[in-house]
C-alpha cells in the first residue's frame, strides 16, 4: 500500500505537476511571469534551493569552536596551581592593576590584554584594581 502510493506520486502526480508548471523557454521569459505563475513555481524553487544547500553544506566553512575553553593558556603551566602573593603594604603607587584574564604578557600585572580577549570571545573580564588609600 505504501509503495503503491509512493509509486503513484513519482510516476503520475509528479510528472503532471511538472507539466503544469509555467517554465519559460528563455531566461527573459521569467520577467514576463505573473504573480500566480511565481506562486506555482514557489514549491519547486524551494525544494531546489534546499537540495542545493544540502549539497554545498559539507563544503562550507565550519564555525570555529572557542579554543579559549581553558582560562590559563600559557602562564606557569608547570605549576599545578598558579598563586601570586603581593604584599599590599608594599604598594608604591596609588593604583595597581592585576590581570584576571591570564593573557597578559606582564602577568600578574595587567597590560590590557583583556580588551582583545573580550572582543574575540565576547567575555567581559577586566583587571583587578588595587587602590592605596591615602589618609
From Swiss-Prot:
Cytoplasmic side, ranges: 61-135
Membrane topology category: Single-pass membrane protein
Full protein name: CDGSH iron-sulfur domain-containing protein 2A
Cofactor: binding comment: Binds 1 [2Fe-2S] cluster.
Cofactors required: [2Fe-2S] cluster
Localisation per UniProt entry: Endoplasmic reticulum membrane; Mitochondrion outer membrane
GO molecular function: 2 iron, 2 sulfur cluster binding; metal ion binding; protein homodimerization activity
Amino acid at each position: 500500500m505504501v509503495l503503491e502510493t509512493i509509486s503513484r506520486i513519482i510516476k503520475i502526480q509528479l510528472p503532471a505537476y511538472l507539466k503544469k508548471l509555467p517554465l519559460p523557454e528563455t531566461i527573459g521569459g521569467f520577467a514576463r511571469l505573473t504573480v500566480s505563475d511565481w506562486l506555482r513555481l514557489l514549491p519547486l524553487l524551494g525544494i531546489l534551493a534546499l537540495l542545493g544547500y544540502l549539497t554545498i553544506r559539507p563544503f562550507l566553512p565550519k564555525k570555529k569552536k572557542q579554543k579559549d575553553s581553558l582560562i590559563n593558556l600559557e602562564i606557569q603551566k608547570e605549576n599545578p596551581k598558579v598563586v601570586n602573593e603581593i604584599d599590599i603594604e608594599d604598594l608604591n603607587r596609588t593604583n595597581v592593576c592585576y590581570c584576571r584574564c591570564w593573557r597578559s604578557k606582564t602577568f600578574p600585572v595587567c597590560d590590557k590584554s583583556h580588551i582583545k580577549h573580550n572582543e574575540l570571545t565576547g567575555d567581559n573580564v577586566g583587571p583587578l584594581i588595587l587602590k592605596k588609600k591615602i589618609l
